[in-house]
C-alpha cells in the first residue's frame, strides 16, 4: 500500500474506531490496539528539535532555589504573615467551586490557631510533621491512612530522610545527614549525632588519584561515551536516561542548606532537625532555623565545571499512584526519592572510577524538568511535571553533572503539549485548584506568578501555595494530577490514541475521554474520588494484589 493510501486508510480506521467507542468501549479497545501505534506515527509523528522547545524570554533570570514552596518554609520571614494564594477564589475563573480557598484556615485550626489563616511556614511544617509520622493525620483511621499504610510510607521514604539529606525539598551543594556514631568496642550508640555527607556526595577526591595514576578511561568519541554511560545508568537502576548539555540557565542562582539544630526527643535521643519539633508538639508554636546560603560555585564545591548532565527517570508504581491522595501513593513517591539518591550515587562512583568528576543531585542544585526536556526524556505538561512517553508523569527525575563530554540527546515532541491544551483533567482533579485551567501555556510575566514561580518562561501557571496547603490538610503528598493523567497508563497504545486525538479535529473534543471510556483513572472530581469509595477500593486492591502492574 502506498504511503498516501496507507495514511488515509489508517486515519479512517482510527476515526471509525473512535466513533464506535461510544457504543462499545471494550470492543474498540481490541480493535484499536493493532492499528493505533502505526496510525500515531503517521498522523502525529514524534519529532526532534535541536533547540529548547519552549519560549524563554530575554528577561529570564535563574531561579532562586530558596523560593520554592518547601525551601521557603525554613525562612523565618515566611512565618510572619498568612500564606497567600495567587488567586483568592479561582471559581471566578473556572466557574466551578473553589475547593482550595479555605485550606489556610483549616490548617490553622489543625494547629490550634483561631482567628487567622496559617502562615506559609506553619502550613508546610504541619505537612512535614505528619509526613514524618510525628503527628497523626486527621484521616488516620481511614483506609489509605492507617498505621499499616503509614508504616509502608515510612519505609519507602527512609533512605531519602536518613541517608540522602532531605534533598527532596531542594538544597545544595551536595547533602549532609546526621548519623549516630557507634563505639565498635562496646556497640553503644551515641545519643548525639554528627553531620556527615549524604548520598548526594560531591567528594571527588578519587578522581585525582585515578588521573595521577594515568588510569583515566579514554573514550573514542562523545557518542561512544554517551552509549556507555547510558548503558551503565540503566544497569545501576534508572528506567529512562538521556544526556543534556550543561545549560547554566537551569542552575539555581542560590544554593541553600537547611540549618539543623539539636532537638531532644521523648526517647532521650537528640535529633537534628530544621525545625523545633518538640516545641511544636507541646503547643509552643512553629519555629524554623533558616538556611546556610551558598553561591553556585562548581569549582569551589565540586572541583570542576560541568560539561554534561546525565538525567534519569525512575518509574513510580502504577497501582500505588491510583490510590492518590492516600498515603500509599506517597509511598511510591518516597521509594523513588530514596532510589534517586542511591542510583545517582552509584552513577557518580562509576564516573569517578573512570577518572571523571561527578556531582549527583536530586531536586537540588538545578531545575530538573527543563534538563530532562533537553535530554529528550519527555515534554513539560500542564501540571508542571515532565510527561514521558512511557510513564507519563508517573516518575521522579534525578541527575548527575560531570566534566565528561557526552553527546547530548535532542528534545522530543510527541503530542503532550497539544493534548494538555485540550484535556485539563489534572486541573479538574486538583483538590486545591492549584493548576491553571487556561487553554494555552504562555510566557508568564511577574504579575502572573505566585512567589515560587519563575517568570519569563512558557508554561501553565501553578500555585504551589495551594498545592502545599492541601498536602498539609491531607497529611500526605497528593498525586491526583499524576493518577488521572491520560499519559499515566501501563498500556502505551493509549498514549498513541492521545497523540492522534490532538491532530484530528473530529476527535479533539473527545481527547481526554478515551481512557475514561476504557475504564481507567476513576473519578476526576477530587471529592468524588474519596466519597465514592474509589480510593479505598484501590487501596484494598493494592494490598490484595501481590504482583505490581508493570509497563
Curated annotation (Swiss-Prot):
Lipid bilayer topology: Peripheral membrane protein
Needed co-factor(s): [4Fe-4S] cluster; corrinoid
Cofactor binding notes: Binds 2 [4Fe-4S] clusters.
Gene3D superfamilies (alphabetical): 3.30.70.20
A Pfam family matched in the record: TAT_signal
Enzyme Commission number: 1.21.99.5
Principal cellular location given in the protein's record: membrane
Residues noted as binding [4Fe-4S] cluster 2 in the record, renumbered to the chain: 430, 467, 478, 481
Annotated compartments: Cell membrane
Annotated ranges, domain 4Fe-4S ferredoxin-type: 411-440, 478-496
Post-translational modification remark: Predicted to be exported by the Tat system. The position of the signal peptide cleavage has not been experimentally proven.
Signal peptide, first to last residue: 1-39
Transmembrane residue ranges: none
GO CC entries: plasma membrane
Catalysed reactions, semicolon-separated: trichloroethene + chloride + A + H(+) = tetrachloroethene + AH2; trichloroethene + AH2 = (Z)-1,2-dichloroethene + chloride + A + H(+)
GO MF term list: 4 iron, 4 sulfur cluster binding; metal ion binding; oxidoreductase activity
Residues holding [4Fe-4S] cluster 1: 420, 423, 426, 485
Entry-linked PROSITE patterns: 4FE4S_FER_1 (PS00198), 4FE4S_FER_2 (PS51379), TAT (PS51318)
Alphabetical UniProt keywords: 4Fe-4S, Cell membrane, Iron, Iron-sulfur, Membrane, Metal-binding, Oxidoreductase, Repeat, Signal
Induction: Coexpressed with pceB.
Function noted in UniProt: Catalyzes the reductive dechlorination of tetrachloroethene (PCE) to trichloroethene (TCE) and of trichloroethene to cis-1,2-dichloroethene (DCE).
Family assignment from sequence similarity: Belongs to the PceA family.
Protein name, as recorded: Tetrachloroethene reductive dehalogenase
Amino acid at each position: 500500500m502506498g504511503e498516501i493510501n496507507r495514511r488515509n486508510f489508517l486515519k479512517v480506521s482510527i476515526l471509525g474506531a473512535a466513533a464506535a467507542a461510544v457504543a462499545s468501549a471494550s470492543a474498540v479497545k481490541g480493535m484499536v490496539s493493532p492499528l493505533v501505534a502505526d496510525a500515531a506515527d503517521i498522523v502525529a509523528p514524534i519529532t526532534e528539535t535541536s533547540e529548547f522547545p519552549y519560549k524563554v524570554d530575554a528577561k529570564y533570570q535563574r531561579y532562586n532555589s530558596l523560593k520554592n514552596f518547601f525551601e521557603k518554609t525554613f525562612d523565618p520571614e515566611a512565618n510572619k504573615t498568612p500564606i497567600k494564594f495567587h488567586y483568592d477564589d479561582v471559581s471566578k475563573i473556572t466557574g466551578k467551586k473553589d475547593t482550595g480557598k479555605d485550606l489556610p484556615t483549616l490548617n490553622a485550626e489543625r494547629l490550634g490557631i483561631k482567628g487567622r489563616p496559617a502562615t506559609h511556614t506553619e502550613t508546610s511544617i504541619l505537612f512535614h510533621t505528619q509526613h514524618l509520622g510525628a503527628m497523626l493525620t486527621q484521616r488516620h483511621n481511614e483506609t489509605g491512612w492507617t498505621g499499616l499504610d503509614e508504616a509502608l510510607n515510612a519505609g519507602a521514604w527512609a533512605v531519602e530522610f536518613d541517608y540522602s539529606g532531605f534533598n527532596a525539598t531542594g538544597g545544595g551543594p551536595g547533602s549532609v545527614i546526621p548519623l549516630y556514631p557507634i563505639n565498635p568496642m562496646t556497640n553503644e550508640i551515641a545519643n548525639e549525632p554528627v553531620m556527615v555527607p549524604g548520598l548526594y556526595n560531591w567528594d571527588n577526591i578519587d578522581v585525582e588519584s585515578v588521573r595521577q595514576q594515568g588510569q583515566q578511561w579514554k573514550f573514542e568519541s562523545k557518542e561512544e561515551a554517551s552509549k556507555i554511560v547510558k548503558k551503565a545508568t540503566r544497569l545501576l537502576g534508572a528506567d529512562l536516561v538521556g544526556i543534556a548539555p550543561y545549560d547554566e540557565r537551569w542552575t539555581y542562582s542560590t544554593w541553600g542548606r537547611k540549618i539543623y539544630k539539636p532537638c531532644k526527643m521523648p526517647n532521650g535521643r537528640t535529633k537534628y532537625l530544621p525545625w523545633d519539633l518538640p516545641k511544636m508538639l507541646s503547643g509552643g508554636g512553629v519555629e524554623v532555623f533558616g538556611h546556610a546560603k551558598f553561591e553556585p560555585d562548581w569549582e569551589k564545591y565540586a572541583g570542576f565545571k560541568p560539561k554534561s548532565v546525565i538525567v534519569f527517570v525512575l518509574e513510580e508504581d502504577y497501582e500505588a499512584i491510583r490510590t492518590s491522595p492516600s498515603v500509599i501513593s506517597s509511598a511510591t513517591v518516597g521509594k523513588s526519592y530514596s532510589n534517586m539518591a542511591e542510583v545517582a550515587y552509584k552513577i557518580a562512583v562509576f564516573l569517578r572510577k573512570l577518572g571523571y568528576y561527578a556531582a549527583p543531585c536530586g531536586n537540588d542544585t538545578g531545575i530538573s524538568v527543563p534538563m530532562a526536556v533537553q535530554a529528550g526524556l519527555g515534554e513539560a505538561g500542564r501540571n508542571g511535571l515532565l510527561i514521558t512517553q512511557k510513564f507519563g508523569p508517573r516518575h521522579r527525575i534525578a541527575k548527575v553533572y560531570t566534566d565528561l563530554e557526552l553527546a547530548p540527546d535532542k528534545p522530543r515532541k510527541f503530542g503532550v503539549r497539544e493534548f494538555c491544551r485540550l484535556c485539563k483533567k489534572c486541573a479538574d482533579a486538583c483538590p486545591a485548584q492549584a493548576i491553571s485551567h487556561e487553554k494555552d501555556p504562555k510566557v508568564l510575566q511577574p504579575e502572573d506568578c505566585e512567589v515560587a514561580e519563575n517568570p519569563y518562561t512558557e508554561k501553565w501557571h501553578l500555585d504551589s501555595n495551594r498545592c502545599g496547603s492541601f498536602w498539609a490538610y491531607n497529611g500526605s503528598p497528593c498525586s491526583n494530577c499524576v493518577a488521572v493523567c491520560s499519559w499515566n497508563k501501563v498500556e502505551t497504545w493509549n498514549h498513541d490514541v492521545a497523540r492522534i486525538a490532538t491532530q484530528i479535529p473530529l476527535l479533539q473534543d473527545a481527547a481526554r475521554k478515551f481512557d475514561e471510556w476504557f475504564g481507567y483513572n476513576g473519578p476526576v472530581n477530587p471529592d468524588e474520588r474519596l466519597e465514592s469509595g474509589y480510593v479505598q477500593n484501590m487501596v484494598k486492591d493494592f494490598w490484595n494484589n501481590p504482583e505490581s502492574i508493570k509497563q
